[in-house]
Curated annotation (Swiss-Prot):
This is Peptidoglycan recognition protein 3. It comes from Mus musculus. Belongs to the N-acetylmuramoyl-L-alanine amidase 2 family. SUPFAM superfamilies: N-acetylmuramoyl-L-alanine amidase-like. Pattern receptor that binds to murein peptidoglycans (PGN) of Gram-positive bacteria. Has bactericidal activity towards Gram-positive bacteria. May kill Gram-positive bacteria by interfering with peptidoglycan biosynthesis. Also binds to Gram-negative bacteria, and has bacteriostatic activity towards Gram-negative bacteria. Plays a role in innate immunity. Transmembrane segments: none annotated. One of its GO terms (biological process) is biological process involved in interaction with host. GO terms for cellular component: extracellular region; protein-containing complex. Peptidoglycan binds at residues 237, 248.
């Protein structure tokens, strides 16, 4: 369970640490993935450094006070994220135990899965193991050391923004500016899945419709598999369907990530009569009987909100299922039952 900084005992502790200078910090003790017994890292989407954001959260209900127990907790967390949520690894870049040690998550160079819209521009740090609901002085000190280390070594911008604040508007270390009101989800670019170069007609923007689709093939839960799935889809659409490019504007994996198809500015090939006026968003997989997971649904909704905010989609858009405008099973009944509850849906 993740919580924000609203615990009544947290403020006095944090205020004490605000008096400390980051210049006085030392190097953190980092327990490596090998040391805590991590399963193989399968998240491979790189993080562009230094990142401008720092996200700090807390994992509750799992206590530990020493490295052996805390390592076991981190292994359990990794297993939960991979097997229950279908993600490619543990959600955070680093975790800080109540024993005062830092545990390597996906590390410095790989995107985490902690905060939709910020995974590609932030370091995600999570406290865990506390008995009383707020981090121990040792954990707070270790986090301060970790932040200082990240800045000194070029992983975190010296002018970083910390979006999540205390209700009293105090945070672990001074924040530097306001959080933007809305942030777009991380979109894995065409270059990451090694897209073939194409030259297709331009989109008529802003789009007036959103059409939700499923690919009807296999789903993917890990970024490496999703990258292959998108690349294979493009090849099938070009070589077998004689399309100009991959049919969809964007694809969403069960890893909770959005993958760029033809993108915002190019016509899709997903729905006859709508390709130049509708954004086609495809969930990778078959969702006739079972719906997509929560992470992928949130990613798609965030993408739609982003499209409106960026001017790619009109604010009074209509959202439809693929089957509403084509004689086809897509997006599958299980997914259709969900999207018909979304804003702007029109049967």
């Amino acid at each position: 369970m993740l919580v924000s900084w609203d615990h009544p005992k947290m403020l006095p502790r944090l205020l004490g640490f605000l008096a400390l200078s980051l210049l006085a910090c030392g190097n953190p003790t980092i327990v490596s993935r090998k040391e805590w017994g991590a399963s193989s890292l399968t998240c491979r989407v790189p993080l562009s450094l230094p990142v401008p954001y720092l996200i700090i959260e807390q994992v509750t209900r799992m206590q530990c006070q020493d490295q052996i127990t805390c390592s076991q907790v981190v292994r359990v967390l990794q297993s939960q994220y991979v097997h229950n949520k279908g993600w490619c690894d543990i959600a955070f870049n680093f975790l800080v135990g109540d024993d005062g040690k830092v545990y390597e998550g996906v590390g410095w160079y790989v995107q985490g899965l902690h905060t939709q819209g910020y995974n590609n521009v932030s370091l995600g740090i999570a406290f865990f193991g506390s008995k009383i609901g707020s981090p121990s002085p040792a954990a707070l000190s270790a986090t301060e050391d970790l932040i200082f280390f990240a800045i000194q070594n070029g992983y975190l911008s010296p002018k970083y923004i910390q979006p999540f604040l205390l209700k009293e508007e105090t945070c672990l270390v001074p924040q530097h500016s306001e959080i933007p009101k809305k942030a777009c989800p991380n979109i894995t670019p065409r270059s990451a899945w090694e897209a073939r170069e194409t030259h297709c007609p331009q989109m008529n923007l802003p789009a007036k419709f959103v059409i939700i689709i499923h690919t009807a093939g296999k789903s993917c839960n890990e970024s490496a598999d999703c990258l292959v799935r998108v690349r294979d889809t493009q090849s099938f659409h070009i070589d077998n369907q004689d399309f100009c490019d991959i049919a969809y504007h964007f694809l969403v994996g069960q890893d909770g990530e959005v993958y760029e198809g033809v993108g915002w500015n190019i016509e899709g090939s997903h729905t006859y009569g709508y390709n130049d006026i509708a954004l086609g968003i495809a969930f990778m997989g078959n969702f006739v009987e079972k719906p997509p997971n929560e992470a992928s649904l949130k990613a798609a909704q965030s993408l739609i909100q982003c499209a409106v905010a960026k001017g790619y989609l009109t604010s009074n858009y209509l959202l439809m299922g693929h089957s509403d405008v084509s004689n086809i099973l897509s997006p599958g009944q299980a997914l259709y039952n969900i999207i018909k509850t979304w804003p702007h849906f029109k049967h």
